[in-house]
């Protein structure tokens, strides 16, 4: 059993995200998600960005944007943005 979040693309092994998308790393295992850049304007996603800034500043361990929440919380928030 599974579900699909249309706004989130399956992370590929390529380091680059497609045009209009951005890679973020989420959860303890730093799972990679590729999300639309339009999420950056959403208040609920901006809250996640504020948490990331408080925890990591501008030094993100994966080299990309790291979101300090569980994968479940991230998927719940992003599913509401679709």
UniProtKB/Swiss-Prot annotation:
Induction: By auxin. Keywords: Auxin signaling pathway. Coiled coil: none annotated. GO terms for biological process: auxin-activated signaling pathway. The keyword Oxidoreductase does not apply. InterPro entries: SAUR_fam (IPR003676). Belongs to the ARG7 family. This is Auxin-induced protein 15A. It comes from Glycine max.
